[in-house]
Amino acid sequence: DHNVEQEFVKKEDYVLDLEPTDGEIQMAHKGRLWFHVHVKGITAHASKPEKGADAIFAASKFIVQIQEIFEHFPVHEELGYSTITFGQIQGGYQPYVVPDACTIFIDCRLAPPVTDQIVVQHFNKIIKEIETQIPGIKISYDITGNRPYIEKNPGSILLKNLKEAVEAETKRSR
C-alpha cells in the first residue's frame, strides 16, 4: 500500500525483488534510506574551545539521539527491527583544533510501519534541538537514496505461481 501511495507501483503491478535470500522466497523487504548529514561548527584552538563550536561533538549527540529513537520503533512481524548504521564519519583535521565540520554517512533500513517521512521528522526535530543547545552549530542533510519497503500480499497470484515453480524445480516445499 505504501508503494502504491508513493506511486512507485500501480495497485495492479507485481514486484519481484531478486536480492540474495539464500534461495528462499521472501514475501516482504525492508526499505532503504541513505543520508549524508553535514554538521558545520566554528573552528577554534583547543586551548580555547569556548570560542568554537565542535562539529564532531554535535554529530555525536545526533548519532546517540537518532539511535535511541530507532531502538523504540515498532518491530515488524517478519522483517524485524528498523535499523540505522553510521557507516562512515569524516571530520576534524588536527587534535589541537576544535573541528568545524563533520559528515556522517547513514544507512537506514525501514520495516513497516516506519516510513521515510517518519525518519525525516525525527531528524528535523533532533537537528533543531542540537542547533539550539550548541550555539554556532548548523546541521543539514541530503537524502542520497530512498527505496520504500515492500509489504507482503499473501494472496498474490505471482507468489503462488513462483512457489509452485520453485517446488516443482527443486522438489522442496517453500
Regions found by a protein language model. Give the residues of each.
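Acidic/histidine-rich catalytic neighborhood of metal-dependent amide-processing enzymes
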Residues: 1-34
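Metal-dependent amide/peptide-bond hydrolase catalytic core
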Residues: 20, 27, 36-174
